[in-house]
Amino acid sequence: MNSDLSNAAAGQRDDRDFVLAAVKTSGVAIRSASERLRADPDVALQAVRQNGRALEFVADQCRGDRKIVQAAVGKWAIALQFASPDLRDDRDIVLRAVRKWGVAVKYASERLRADREIVLIAVKRNSAALKYASDELRAELQAGHPSIRQLGTGAVTLSRDDNEG
């Protein structure tokens, strides 16, 4: 089966079984599914389980579904950027993302970018994450920790996971 729904007939793009089969092979195929199916939580969940980037293409209400966002972030930490504002302020979801890719902290809410534990985990995973901490926390961390002061200067070589999560 061709998992690219862009060439599928309109009826197939709205056929739940057809679309489910497609997104199990290629999660981002959901981008060409009907609006109704992009809003279907089961279809969205299958898509993000296959490819976290699929969160970009699901309906807004699915971006606010905790289970869907957790699955997406578990596959691809950068998917956090497509989560609803409420879920970008969800400590557990943000922790899951930054443990996978530290720089994902840049997509967290302002409140969580000021959370010491989250920022320290992010910086341990990837030194580039420090620049996304709140100004106050970044200054505090740089003043209190010699190694973090060094991180803030950009003098540290970035880890290989700086590319993506």
Segment roles from a protein language model:
Residues 1-165:
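Non-catalytic tandem-repeat scaffold regions and their flanking low-complexity/translocation tails
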